């Protein structure tokens, strides 16, 4: 979903270099230095307005989190949440999900999250889906052996596509939820969109897969 352009968004990011890594190429291979510790690093590709990444950071202080989004205004709203939370273990990047190997070394990321990604329903846009094989190639390079992807969506078509994509890639589907909010799954942290969908009674799909 697109967000209306936010005035001053660029300046907002530039004025907060502690949380927003403005030159992420320079951090490649040295993210432990950026965070000041050697804790595991989890990333969310398509972090939206930051509810999930901030919530996870507060819930798990022993894990470092990086929220990634290419949309300037969206990332500025995520920064608002990070600043309000004062979570020391979260950083933000404005980069494209297809270029992650420019910013992370092999195996430097321990886990990644894909939450409510754009489904790109038209066949001609298949390669833009974040669970397309080309993206999986990228994710595999920055995750360790048996690295995990946790995926959530309200879009059944994208969920079915992703199940097939992960399986055809040779990944292992650890767990699958066909109605997350009706399940006994504990510890779910919702995104802004997820909270909105939940109020409408929409089904949320979730899976965990490993390389």
UniProtKB/Swiss-Prot annotation:
Q: What does UniProt list as catalytic? A: 118
Q: Which residues bind S-adenosyl-L-methionine?
A: 44, 69, 96, 118
The record's section on PROSITE patterns has: SAM_MT_TRMB
Query: For substrate, which residues are the binding ones?
Result: 122, 154, 191-194
Enzyme Commission number(s) of this protein: 2.1.1.33
The reaction(s) catalysed by this protein are: guanosine(46) in tRNA + S-adenosyl-L-methionine = N(7)-methylguanosine(46) in tRNA + S-adenosyl-L-homocysteine
Q: Does the keyword Ubl conjugation apply?
A: no
- Read off the CDD domains from this record: AdoMet_MTases
Q: In which pathway does it act?
A: tRNA modification; N(7)-methylguanine-tRNA biosynthesis
Single GO molecular function: tRNA (guanine(46)-N7)-methyltransferase activity
Give the start-end ranges of region Interaction with RNA: 124-129
* Cellular compartments per GO CC: tRNA methyltransferase complex
InterPro entries on file: SAM-dependent_MTases_sf (IPR029063), tRNA_(Gua-N-7)_MeTrfase_Trmb (IPR003358), tRNA_methyltr_TrmB_bact (IPR055361)
Q: Which UniProt keywords apply?
A: Methyltransferase, S-adenosyl-L-methionine, Transferase, tRNA processing
What the record says about family reads: Belongs to the class I-like SAM-binding methyltransferase superfamily. TrmB family.
Q: What does this gene product do?
A: Catalyzes the formation of N(7)-methylguanine at position 46 (m7G46) in tRNA.
Protein name per its UniProtKB record: tRNA (guanine-N(7)-)-methyltransferase
Q: Which gene encodes it?
A: trmB
């Amino acid at each position: 979903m697109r967000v209306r352009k936010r005035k001053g968004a660029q300046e907002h990011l530039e004025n907060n270099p502690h949380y927003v890594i403005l030159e992420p190429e320079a951090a490649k291979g040295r993210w432990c230095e950026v965070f000041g510790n050697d804790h595991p690093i989890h990333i969310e590709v398509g972090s939206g307005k930051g509810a999930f990444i901030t919530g996870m950071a507060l819930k798990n202080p022993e894990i470092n989190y990086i929220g990634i989004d290419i949309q300037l205004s969206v990332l500025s709203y995520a920064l608002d949440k990070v600043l309000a939370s004062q979570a020391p273990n979260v950083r933000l990047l404005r980069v494209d999900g297809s270029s992650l190997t420019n910013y992370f070394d092999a195996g430097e990321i321990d886990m990644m999250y894909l939450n409510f990604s754009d489904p790109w329903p038209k066949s001609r846009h298949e390669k833009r889906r974040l669970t397309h094989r080309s993206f999986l190639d990228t994710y595999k390079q920055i995750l360790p052996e048996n690295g995990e992807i946790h995926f959530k969506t309200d879009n059944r078509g994208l969920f079915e596509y992703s199940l097939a994509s992960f399986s055809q890639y040779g990944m292992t589907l650890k767990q699958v939820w066909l109605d997350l909010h009706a399940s006994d799954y504990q510890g779910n942290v919702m995104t802004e969109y997820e909270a909105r969908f939940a109020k409408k009674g929409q089904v949320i799909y979730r899976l965990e897969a490993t390389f």
